[in-house]
Amino acid sequence: MVITLVGEKLAKPGVEFIYYGPAEPCKSCRLARVCTGNLEPGRRYKIIKVRNMEYPCLLHEGKVRVVEVVEPAIDVIIEPRYAVAGSKITLKFVECDDPEKVDLVRPEGLFEGDVVKILEIIGDIECNGRKYKIAKVIRENTQK
């Protein structure tokens, strides 16, 4: 679990977002360390709790709220030989040219080389004439 700040309109439990890095106004903000310093660029986060504290913000239409976030489970296509629920693997993205499957082939929030735990196998999928599995995974170093 990580403490960070998000715009007041976004501050609802269950909301997911991708952190792309600090915006220009953030670089001179006194809250930048709490707001952006705890997040990793390119990662997906899910708000699990909204706290009652709020602060002024130049970027988020006036206010940000203190929230608790986690990296959520993410669906990704993997090789069938690695598809064992409960196992840990080093993520390697499969070769797939189908633009409709890009969100499963290279999902935002995961990077090739991440160590992930396979939570469950969701189903089968085919691409480029090959059969793969869709797995729900979570980055292993987020499991505390």
From Swiss-Prot:
It comes from the Archaea. It holds the Pfam family UPF0179. InterPro entries: UPF0179. Transmembrane segments: none annotated. Coiled coil: none annotated. Belongs to the UPF0179 family. HAMAP family: UPF0179 (MF_00498). PANTHER family: UPF0179 PROTEIN MJ1627. This is UPF0179 protein PF1381. The lineage of its organism: Archaea, Methanobacteriati, Methanobacteriota, Thermococci, Thermococcales.
